[in-house]
Structure formats: C-alpha cells, structure tokens
Amino acid sequence: MARLSPGKAACWMVLGLLIPSLTESSILNSECPQLCVCEIRPWFTPQSTYREATTVDCNDLRLTRIPGNLSSDTQVLLLQSNNIAKTVDELQQLFNLTELDFSQNNFTNIKEVGLANLTQLTTLHLEENQISEMTDYCLQDLSNLQELYINHNQISSISANAFSGLKNLLRLHLNSNKLKVIDSRWFDSTPNLEILMIGENPVIGILDMNFRPLSNLRSLVLAGMYLTDIPGNALVGLDSLESLSFYDNKLIKVPQLALQKVPNLKFLDLNKNPIHKIQEGDFKNMLRLKELGINNMGELVSVDRYALDNLPELTKLEATNNPKLSYIHRLAFRSVPALESLMLNNNALNAVYQKTVESLPNLREISIHSNPLRCDCVIHWINSNKTNIRFMEPLSMFCAMPPEYRGQQVKEVLIQDSSEQCLPMISHDTFPNHLNMDIGTTLFLDCRAMAEPEPEIYWVTPIGNKITVETLSDKYKLSSEGTLEIANIQIEDSGRYTCVAQNVQGADTRVATIKVNGTLLDGAQVLKIYVKQTESHSILVSWKVNSNVMTSNLKWSSATMKIDNPHITYTARVPVDVHEYNLTHLQPSTDYEVCLTVSNIHQQTQKSCVNVTTKTAAFALDISDHETSTALAAVMGSMFAVISLASIAIYIAKRFKRKNYHHSLKKYMQKTSSIPLNELYPPLINLWEGDSDKDKDGSADTKPTQVDTSRSYYMW
C-alpha cells in the first residue's frame, strides 16, 4: 500500500480539520429561522454511536407552520410542542435530514406530515398528536427509518400494510393509543425490529402467534393493557427475546406455558398484577433468566414449593411491596445456584425459613426489613455465625410477635431466645374470612402455615369431617401445600371451614365462612350454650364445642361468662376445663342474656348466647281437707278466691321487686371485696377438652361450679 509523503499527510490533516469548520460556518452564516437555534450538537445514532449533527431547534415556539428558510444541510430538525397540523413542501429540500421531531403538535393524519422523499431519515417522532389511523403504505418512502415513535396518539386502526417499506426499522413505539387488536401482519414488513412497545392499549386480548414474524425482537413491552390471560402460543417465534414486561395488567396467574416458548429470556417484569400465588412450574427451566420482578402485587399471598425451579442463571429476585405476601415455602427454590440478591422487604412475611436460604448457595444479600417478623425459632438463623449473607437495612428489622418482643430489633431479641421448636402460625392473608360463591363453581382455599417443626395442615368441614391429603372424595381435595378444593359447590356446602395447622408444639386455626348464593346454613356453629336448669335465683348453663373443629390442644387466652339485662351487667372468668356453670344471686322472674366468649392468641373469638327468665318465687298454700262432701263446692270456691288473691299478690310483689332490686343489689355488691379475675383463675384456658377425655378423667360426675356473681366485675 502506498504511503503518503509527510507534506501530503499534513495537507490532508489540515483539510480534515477545516471541513467540519466550513460546514458549521455555512449553517451559522445562512439565515436561521427567527427564534430558532441553529448549531452543531452531539447526536447519537439508533445504535448509540456518537456523532455531531447540524441541528435546528424550533421547540416550544407555538408555530403553526414549518419555517420556510431551512438550510438544506439540516440533519436534525426539532419542532416539538408547537401547533403545526399540516405541511406543504417545506421538508422536500432537506435531503440530509436524519431526525425529525414533530411530537406534541396537531397532526391528525400521517400524510399531512409530508414525509415523501426523506430517504435519509432514521428517527421520526410523532408522539402526542391526534393521529387516529395508519393506512396502507403511509410510511413507504422512509426506507432508512430505524426509530418510529408514534405513541400517545388516538390510533384505533392500523392497516395490514401500514409499515410496508420499513425493513430497517429497529424500534417501534405504539403504546398509549386506542388499539383493540394486534395484527401479526403489521410485522411482516419489519423483520429486523428489535424493540416493540405496544402497552397501554385497550386490546381485547393477545392471540396465538401474534408476534411470530419478529424473530429478531429483543425487547417487548405489554404493560397496562388489562390483560387477564396470555395464550400458550402467544410468544411463539420470539427466539431472540431477552426482555419482557407484563407490568400493570390483570393477570391472575403466571403465564407459564407462554413463557416456556421464549428460550432466551433474561429479564421478566410481572410487577403490579393480581397474581394470587407463585406455584410449582411457574418459573421452570428458564435457562437464561437473570432477573425477575414480582413487586407491587396486591393479591400475592404465597410462593409455594418449587415455584422457582431450574433457573441456573437467575441472579436477582425482587418480590417487594406485596401487602399480602405472608408465606414462602422452605423449598420454594430448587436448582437456583446463581442467585445473589433476594429482595423481600415491605411484605407481610412473618419469617423466612433457614432452609430456604441454605438452598441458595451463592446468596450475597437479602432484604426482609419492613415485615411483621415473628421473633422465635423460625428465624434464629439470622443470628447464626454460619451465614455470611448481608442484610439490607438491618435497623428496620423489628419484631411484631410474640407480644413481649413487639417493637424490638430482631437481632437483640434472637440473642435472648434460643428455642428450637415453636407453634404453627397460619398466614392470615392466604384466604379470606368471608366468601360468597355462586352455585356450581369450584372454590379454592389456600391455607399456609410456618413453624418448627413443619406443621401438618388439614381442613374441617362445617359438619365436622376432617379433610387430609389422603382423603378420597368427589367433593373435597387437599393439596400437599394446604389448598382445599371444593368442587361444584351447593347451598348445603355453605358454612364455616376451618384450617388446622398442627405440630408437636400445638396447633393454630383459621376459619373461612362460605355463603352460597348469599345463603349460610345454620349448621356451622362451633360453640353452643344451653340452659340446663332454671331456678328463681340461679341458672345452670352448659355448652358444647364441636370437637372435630376445635381440637383439644388448641390454647385459648381468655374465656368469659357474661350475664346481662337492661338494669345490670356482670362478668366472670370461666375456670379451666369447665363445661357447666351455675350462675347464682339472680333475681326471680327476670330476663337475662347469658353469653360465653372465648378468644385465642390471635384475637379470634367464638361466642354463643342464650336468653333465659328465672322462675317466680314459690308460695305455699295450705288448704284444709274437709270431710263432708257438702262443703266441696265451698272449698273449691275458696281455693279459686285464694288463687286469685295469690296471683294479684305475686304480680304486686314482682313489680315491687323489679322496681327495687337494682338499688338493693348495687348496695349489696358495693360491700363485697374486689378481687382481680386473674387471681381467681389461671390466665391460660383450655376449654376444648373432648367429652371422651373428660369421662376418662372421671370429671363427668363432678358437680357444676358454683359461681357467686357478686364477686364478678360490676359494670353499668
């Protein structure tokens, strides 16, 4: 290859320096449109290559037409935020134009933009106009166009050949229009498209093969489209897709079948969808996935076993700001060796299992702050010397339970508590307290619980039948996770369904009350109180608990008997293992409401009441027996008179007592000593000992407890 002499080389160098100066001088010396700015500015190509371009900036000038004295050397023309609705031929002499910005103007039709013969144009901005349709071949002259921004318009119709001629198009923004369908024929003319943003359109739905022609697409944004379902073959053909966003849709489950058709996906955004749970198979064998976002999901309650399975390149998982996410299975992750960052803050999590963390060998940082953490054996691993994991914002990690540790920092509490086993705790948001179902539908109730050792979960139906994973039934089916399925639900299936989580330490329960077509049958009452005997000054009550629903090892923190009428109310704490109660010092011929209320450690309560009237005080009537039969009529007449007088006397006495017992009883009770109930009876009460156990203990023959109501709290 011939070499230049030093003199010639110097000449060429000087010439190279002069050419840009001459170009800049020509544009600056030519007449620049009034109020516009004409200068050389940095410019980046669609491939992000740095260049310098001759730029005419006429933004924000309220222009109604394009200035007529534009230089033919113009490469970038900026006319953003004006009032231009139509062009004539002002653009025809701009043969070097590479970027044109008409965003925020008043165009209603693409033909009125005047794009003919702009063969060098690579970037076109038409966002925020009033364009309503794209007709066939409306952009066919833009053979070098690489970026088209036509988002935030009023486009409701795009013809099949609207993008014809755009074989070099790399980026297409169609988001925020009024499209109701996506037609795969649009993309036949854009085989090299790499980025497609088509979100925020009111499409009826995504169809199978919708994006099949886009084999080179790398990023697809389907955000804010109210999508409720993604068909299994909707993403077929997207073999190069690396980034996919379903942000802010209405998906109720992970579109796992569709995701399996995207083999090279690296970044997946499912944020802000009402997905209820992440379950086995949802994210499986996605061999290139690196980052997953499941944030801001208002209905997400659990991440179940093997929900994330065989994801060898996943390095970051974000599952934050999910107000109902209260459960992550200890085996939620399987074969996820590369995960480094696990973000779980601002959820409703009580704990994260140590085994979950141990299944992630490369984990470097975890964020579980701003969760209602239970400071017991389940999270002891946090203070373990075996872990080198960095906790994000550790000063924001506070105990929410047990009550004695509430508000304290987690690490301070765990130093004090070293227990290895703890009671089950059912996650409270996994299923609702009340539901109204339509006849014939299938109901799923998800019950999840955390404890050490891991609890067994079973359900009890309104009639007391126990449903386990081994139960064989056409009506009920229980998954190993704790989800109860009730098929073909009918009116007779209404009632209270109880989830029981049990381990060697005890049990926890939660109840879902199910109505069917607005109807709730009365056969589901758990606690029932009865009147066994009534006297003038006392009432003997007893109660029955459905032992199939409330197991004998369920501990209750309080149980209270309350006697109430319009004039006086008093209460008494019920002793341990009592099933009968004798209420004394009552007034005769008086109406009372008697209620038994029990509460457990989770403030769940059961209550049963009965109305009863005490008997009238007895009067003795002695009537002489006359022997003569002739006096029988007189005796009968006397008896009638006596009975009449007695009835009147009883009525007067009853009125007198009702009028005055209030003050006399108050005076009587004020003389008695006040004894706190927690000194009379133990603070922890177990009411649910089965009748069969009671018989074994020989307690069935014991006399009912005599309770002097004068020693109860006196409330007005």
UniProtKB/Swiss-Prot annotation:
Domain of life: Eukaryota
Keyword Membrane: yes
Domain LRRNT: 26-72
Residue ranges with Basic and acidic residues bias: 691-700
Region: Disordered, residue numbers: 691-716
LRR-type repeats, residues: 73-95, 96-117, 120-141, 144-165, 168-189, 192-213, 216-237, 240-261, 264-285
Subcellular location field: Membrane
Extracellular side: 26-631
Signal sequence extent: 1-25
InterPro entries, A to Z: Cys-rich_flank_reg_C (IPR000483), FN3_dom (IPR003961), FN3_sf (IPR036116), Ig-like_dom (IPR007110), Ig-like_dom_sf (IPR036179), Ig-like_fold (IPR013783), Ig_I-set (IPR013098), Ig_sub (IPR003599)
Residue span, Fibronectin type-III domain: 525-619
Residues in compartment: Cytoplasmic: 653-716
Domain LRRCT: 371-424
SUPFAM superfamilies: Fibronectin type III, Immunoglobulin, L domain-like
Keywords: Disulfide bond, Glycoprotein, Immunoglobulin domain, Leucine-rich repeat, Membrane, Repeat, Signal, Transmembrane, Transmembrane helix
Residues carrying sugar: 69, 96, 106, 117, 385, 517, 582, 611
Membrane topology annotation: Single-pass type I membrane protein
Segments traversing the membrane: 632-652
Name listed for the protein in its UniProt record: Leucine-rich repeat neuronal protein 1
Taxonomic lineage: Eukaryota, Metazoa, Chordata, Craniata, Vertebrata
